[in-house]
Amino acid sequence: MRGDRMSKAPRTAISPTREENYPEWYQQVIRAADLAENSPVRGCMVIKPWGYQLWENVQRALDDMFKATGHQNAYFPLFIPMSFLEKEAEHVEGFAKECAVVTHHRLEPDPDGGLRPAGKLEEPLIVRPTSETIIGATYAKWVQSYRDLPILINQWANVVRWEMRTRMFLRTAEFLWQEGHTVHATSEEAVEETEKMVEVYRDFAENWMAMPVIVGSKTPLERFPGAVETLSIEAMMQDRKALQAGTSHFLGQNFSKAQEIKFQSESGDIEFAWTTSWGVSTRLIGALIMTHSDDDGLVLPPRLAPTHVVIQPIYKDDSRAEVMEYVQSLRDELAAQTYANAPVRVTIDDRDIRGGEKKWYHVKRGVPIRLEVGPKDIAAGTVFCGIRNQPKSVGIDRAELVATIGEKLATLQQELFDAALKMREDNTVELTSEAEFRDFFADKGDTAITGGFAWCHYCDEDSLQPLLKELKVTIRCVPRSDNATEGTCFLTGKPAAQRAIFAKAY
């Protein structure tokens, strides 16, 4: 029957399923969606065109948000003199084990016909793991007076952190990101900036990625090295683990003192500036995959999808001209509609491959809406429509489809957010004892999905460390929206003034 054409499917397009082996399912979704692949360089990945279009959409949206909050883009060196990192002891300690170091500036032939390093550098150069130190040294030259402040700059760049256990998009030796670095005359202004930018990240995560997040403060042991305070957005993935999707750091005067960022105040005094930094990376794509995708492949929120609608013409040789004319006019009508204040992005897939193969190609890539049009549809004035999060496809009047395409995309965006929020709420608990804590986070097998988010009162972060390390759990954040009254520490039974979200994490 015509009504079954887009709904018949194998049991799942991705194997293994999430329940069978979540880590391997994640890797298979990336491959099936053609997002990225491993490179010849250990720990690095090749981001393929579909994945890079997705990253470009992330960039565009965030870049507009940064500029709307008064920030400008600039670019700073990839290489950082080792002496710059040594000026901020806590900072360098946090990154020392991950740094890639350049010690020579050329190659020369060796006697065996190969190449060897030559021209040893006077001072080793670090391939940036983050840019606070090199940017701070530049700001020290730019800032002389309070009139030079604030400085509000963002950089789109690549960074290197020599990870030993890598996973595409989540943890790679080289990754793409943005890092904002700002300088202020007062502590109050810098704190306001820190809070403003974590709110930008929350807005983007929830309204563009359709990914609900918890905004909170990191505890002292979890803060960014050298920061006075770190704010983060934390999301729950479908395996109930947490993923830190973005951070915003109030650096106090720590980096300005190390880098000599000083200015003359209105009163004529020489003062150290107050700085912030904040960033997100291609890790967001990993978060998006694990928040929404299913056992048939990638599921994309429409606001970030490279293509909103794909049209698959179905014809035999004698009907090709008629079908293609109809499909092209349908594409033009749909592209003239708007969704989220931008034109609907529509493509036609006229490749000479089997219809079923073509359908699953787009399902696995997460295209939000798939349309099929053949001679019978033209005669009836209808289009066969499949929406990515719906199990069945249906026929719909062409005029109705065109008139409601923006609404359908908006509905899908909201449904993805609602499903992710429900999943988080269904897997969030409050625990009051060590026994409950151990049971909640206990491993139930190599591939079993267990745990979730646990609200717990606690009184001393240091005393929790042996238990947390044993269970591979971390304190994700102290949520800023939490209005809980004083409670009892789940570990010691002593009075505790605050509570936090605990979870296993990426």
From Swiss-Prot:
Belongs to the class-II aminoacyl-tRNA synthetase family. ProS type 3 subfamily. The lineage of its organism: Bacteria, Pseudomonadati, Planctomycetota, Planctomycetia, Pirellulales. This is Proline--tRNA ligase. GO terms for molecular function: ATP binding; proline-tRNA ligase activity. Catalyzes the attachment of proline to tRNA(Pro) in a two-step reaction: proline is first activated by ATP to form Pro-AMP and then transferred to the acceptor end of tRNA(Pro). Homodimer. GO terms for cellular component: aminoacyl-tRNA synthetase multienzyme complex; cytoplasm. It is an enzyme of class 6 (ligase). GO terms for biological process: prolyl-tRNA aminoacylation. The keyword Ligase applies. PROSITE patterns: AA_TRNA_LIGASE_II (PS50862).
